[in-house]
Amino acid sequence: MRVIISAGGTGGHIYPALAIINKIKEEEPDSEILYIGTTDRMEKDLIPSLGYKYEALEVKGLKRKLTLDNIKTVTCFVSAIKRAKEIIKDFDPDIVIGCGGYVTAPVIYAAKKLGKRTFIHEQNSVVGLANKFLSRYTDKVGVSFESTIKDFPKDKAILTGNPCSEKALSIKATTKDKLGVDKDKKLVLIVMGSLGSRSVNDRIFSFVDKFRNKNYSVIIVTGNSYYERVKERRVPDNVKVVPFIYEMPSVMKITDLMVTRAGASTMSEITALGVPAIFIPSPYVANNHQ
């Protein structure tokens, strides 16, 4: 089977896409996968590093309010459709799958116009702009929440859950030795989504010394964008600061408490693994859905 899968921007879209890829490869090991992402977001480095073919489209996000920027976005979208058609014709997939993010819009639209089978997946409890638009051009829509079925055509919506749940259960737990923390202490994991949060990072580092001499270890995942600002910061011996963790479920499996955003994929993993958690919902998401 030949599959094109597209997702971009944040781990909340990328990791469900990877979970689907893993399932496809598990069922049909000889399947060929082509991933289409953006030119400037985290997937452009992550996906090739995992050994998958990667093509990039230049896309911009559509503002929910009417602005001049949206004119540029539409122009960019038209160019991206043209390029997506070229990629799809060349690869000739059996199916094209979109897991969210602006990059999926030109890919799924182009695929439908070329007569390819299409499927999109909506992870969130509030449907994103891209998937609302794409629902008229796709064959089926997978949703994580029963409440979002009503937002899509009745003959297309399927309650699938979040693909990350199953993947989280299948990933092998890491060890505290590998993480470089005390194996005899409980572990607190602080991570504000795949991109991190400047405001939360700043707040945590304002009291990081209070962790000193506590009977637990702390791992702070800053996000790649913020790591340079704090990597030289002196922290207590029981605190470890890292920019990013790829196989987050492997760490979550040995975590005693997680402090995190309330993203759909993260919550699916936490629920599947039964990790105690404190949520700090992001205020910068569509319709405050976290």
Locations of the language-model features?
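Conserved nucleotide-sugar phosphate-binding/catalytic loop shared by glycosyltransferases and other
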Residues: V3-G8, E27-C76, I81, T160
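Structural loop-to-beta junction motif characteristic of Rossmann-like glycosyltransferase folds
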Residues: Y52, K116-R117, D256-L257, G274-S282
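Donor-nucleotide binding loops and adjacent catalytic segments primarily
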Residues: R41, L46, L50, A173-T175, ...
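Short alpha-helical segment that forms part of, or immediately flanks, the ligand-binding pocket
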Residues: Y109, P249, M267-L273
